[in-house]
Amino acid sequence: MEVKEALFMNKGEGESSYAQSSSFTETVTSMTMPVLENAVETLFSKDFHLLQALNAADLGCAAGPTTFTVISTIKRMMEKKCRELNCQTLELQVYLNDLPGNDFNTLFKGLSSKVVGNKCEEVPCYVVGVPGSFHGRLFPRNSLHLVHSCYSVHWLTQAPKGLTSKEGLALNKGKIYISKTSPPVVREAYLSQFHEDFTMFLNSRSQEVVPNGCMVLILRGRLSSDPSDMESCFTWELLAVAIAELVSQGLIDEDKLDTFNVPSYFPSLEEVKDIVERNGSFTIDHMEGFELDSPQMQENDKWVRGEKFATVARAFTEPIISNQFGHEIMDKLYEKFTHIVVSDLEAKIPKITSIILVLSKIVG
């Protein structure tokens, strides 16, 4: 099965669903709303208010409430600017994109009562689902004015290439992501894959976004130059330990562990900046990295803290993990993961690093 068929957040509205476990993403989205508000204001300063409709896309939208916040913010800012400029009311067309396996049913069920259908709305809003990979083309040329994406662009199209020796041996044995014990070739392979995929993303958007159009991208990243620092490896490192314990119990085939590498990469600011500048289609209007404590760290009881952390981790890791190791082992795996997290959190409480990036499409 290809990554694009297995990469999605846990579905439904149960305890381990993404819809119920995306509070941190909501926090990040809320914190970065002033940046999105400023992006909308900038569009109006470039005469985008003369249009009949503003076309916006939320890429990698998943099925949590963050999308509702994004749409509401764009609508509110459009209404504010239309009143200030005394211009005709624009309509808002929003495209919600994610891979076909995404839980669009839960997304649109929540959307209908929160964003659309308001009889008193100043800016009419029309929402369309667009299943597909954002690493390729999704929209017609010069059709988008604003693109938003939160916690999606760091996912890769595939596990990095070149992680097997000429003799067929796994080069990242016993690990599922970059680790302190990983050889340099593993780090190089991950960066190379991110470079390739992010470049594809930029190339596709460069054709779809109108000149002077804007993109607001938020992704997991790191402040350190070392990709094996715990700020970016914590969850994957502990999951690898949990999987290895099940291997030792004969519940998982060791070869499945040795040949699995997570299709995700948390880049540094310098790496992101370098790729954008090399691409040459967009200017960087704003870029910063910031750290936040995981919300589970506010819990005093270590078991409650560990269980909540594991539940959130399961929401975004289970689909890709179960695709490799089997659905039948998931409850046991995440139970083991919870125990490991509880013992590890007493010594390490890593902050979560995010990168926010505002890009403008170059004219000409």
From Swiss-Prot:
A GO term for molecular function? methyltransferase activity
Enzyme nomenclature, EC number: 2.1.1.-
Tell me which SUPFAM superfamilies the record gives: S-adenosyl-L-methionine-dependent methyltransferases
Cofactor field: Mg(2+)
Keywords, comma-separated and alphabetical: Magnesium, Metal-binding, Methyltransferase, Transferase
The entry's S-adenosyl-L-homocysteine-binding residues are Y18, C61, D98, L99, S133, F134
Q: Would you tell me the protein name for this molecule?
A: Probable methyltransferase ICS2
Q: Which residues form a coiled coil?
A: none
Q: Which organism is it from?
A: Camellia irrawadiensis
Keyword Metal-binding (UniProt): yes
Q: Does the keyword Methyltransferase apply?
A: yes
Instruction: Write out the residues that bind Mg(2+).
Output: N172, D258, F260, N261
Question: Which family is this protein grouped under?
Answer: Belongs to the methyltransferase superfamily. Type-7 methyltransferase family.
Which superkingdom?
Eukaryota
List the InterPro entries hit by this protein, alphabetically: MeTrfase_7 (IPR005299), MeTrfase_capping (IPR042086), SAM-dependent_MTases_sf (IPR029063)
Q: Which gene encodes it?
A: ICS2
Show which residues form the site (Involved in substrate discrimination): H148, R220, S264, V312, H327
Record note on cofactor? Binds 1 Mg(2+) ion per subunit.
Q: Name one GO biological process term.
A: methylation
- According to its UniProt entry, what is the function of this protein? No detectable N-methyltransferase activity.
